């Protein structure tokens, strides 16, 4: 063992959790001295980063912790994606996370890259107790307005969620005609892990729908802007007119 190289030392701690890796490295330092210092420094930085992320995550668990202390067991976070775009549906998600789960990187979907959201989408679906999705299309948005369509999508998401939750954490809204206690949290996607998880599920689900629509209507660039009112999108509407997934009530000002 006394002739181990730096690479061999590093390989010997691969796969261990950070505390066990550091414990082993501190022991190896007595034998290998300076050869271990850079590896120790690397793992200490990893641990600091992990602890910082864990503390951030725990700050987003405050609402959940209070609800658990009050006796609630199944907390569903609810959020939507797609209230503002000129095209496509509004999508809502309802997510119940296990009480002690730690999903590293979980955050408000708007603060994440597309690649981060896609990875977290799979992790959330794997670890969640339940996930429900509700989709309201552009025609219904035109008929009942975007606020009512958003609430309808959220109700559909709750209806598709199993098991039935004890309480709903909703980002900024209250829902009518639902016989479950609700807690409306302003900017909840940045304050509650349950709502943040729902925001990611809703956003990724909607983005995938718009990428599919891009194949059908490639001239609008839906895969890039996801239906939002970018300069590219508005110019395409002026040039080609609207397509079947455009919201008439949102695009009438751009139609010549």
From Swiss-Prot:
It is found in: Cytoplasm. It is an enzyme of class 3 (hydrolase). It comes from the Bacteria. Gene3D superfamilies: Ribonuclease H-like superfamily/Ribonuclease H. Coiled coil: none annotated. Its EC number is 3.1.26.4. One of its GO terms (cellular component) is cytoplasm. The keyword Transmembrane does not apply. Keywords: Cytoplasm, Endonuclease, Hydrolase, Manganese, Metal-binding, Nuclease. Residues 73-256 form the RNase H type-2 domain. GO terms for biological process: DNA replication, removal of RNA primer; mismatch repair. Manganese or magnesium. Binds 1 divalent metal ion per monomer in the absence of substrate. May bind a second metal ion after substrate binding. Its main location: cytoplasm. It catalyses: Endonucleolytic cleavage to 5'-phosphomonoester. PROSITE patterns: RNASE_H_2. InterPro entries: RNase_HII (IPR022898), RNase_HII/HIII (IPR001352), RNase_HII/HIII_dom (IPR024567), RNaseH-like_sf (IPR012337), RNaseH_sf (IPR036397). Its cofactor is Mn(2+); Mg(2+). A divalent metal cation binds at residues 79-80, 171. One of its GO terms (molecular function) is manganese ion binding. HAMAP family: RNase_HII_B (MF_00052_B). Belongs to the RNase HII family. Endonuclease that specifically degrades the RNA of RNA-DNA hybrids. This is Ribonuclease HII. It comes from Acetivibrio thermocellus (strain ATCC 27405 / DSM 1237 / JCM 9322 / NBRC 103400 / NCIMB 10682 / NRRL B-4536 / VPI 7372). The lineage of its organism: Bacteria, Bacillati, Bacillota, Clostridia, Eubacteriales. The gene is rnhB.
């Amino acid at each position: 063992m006394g002739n181990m190289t730096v690479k061999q030392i590093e390989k010997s701690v691969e796969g261990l959790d950070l505390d066990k890796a550091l414990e082993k490295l501190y022991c190896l330092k007595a034998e290998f001295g300076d050869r271990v210092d850079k590896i120790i420094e690397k793992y200490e930085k990893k641990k600091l980063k992990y602890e910082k992320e864990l503390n951030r995550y725990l700050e987003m668990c405050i609402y959940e912790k209070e609800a658990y202390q009050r006796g609630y067991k199944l907390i569903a976070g609810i959020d939507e994606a797609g209230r503002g775009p000129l095209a496509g549906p509004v999508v809502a998600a309802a997510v119940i996370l296990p009480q002690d789960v730690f999903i590293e990187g979980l955050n408000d979907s708007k603060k994440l890259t597309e690649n981060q959201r896609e990875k977290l989408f799979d992790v959330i679906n794997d670890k969640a107790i339940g996930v429900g999705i509700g989709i309201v299309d552009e025609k219904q948005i035109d008929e009942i307005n975007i606020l009512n369509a958003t609430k309808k999508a959220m109700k559909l998401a709750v209806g598709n969620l199993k098991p039935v939750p004890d309480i709903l954490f909703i980002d900024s809204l209250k829902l009518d005609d639902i016989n479950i206690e609700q807690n409306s949290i302003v900017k909840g996607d940045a304050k509650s892990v349950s709502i943040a998880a729902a925001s990611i599920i809703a956003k990724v689900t909607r983005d995938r729908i718009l990428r599919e629509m891009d194949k059908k209507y490639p001239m609008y660039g839906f895969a890039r802007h996801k239906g939002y009112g970018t300069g590219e999108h508005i110019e395409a509407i002026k040039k080609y007119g609207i397509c079947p997934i455009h919201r008439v009530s949102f695009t009438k000002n751009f139609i010549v």
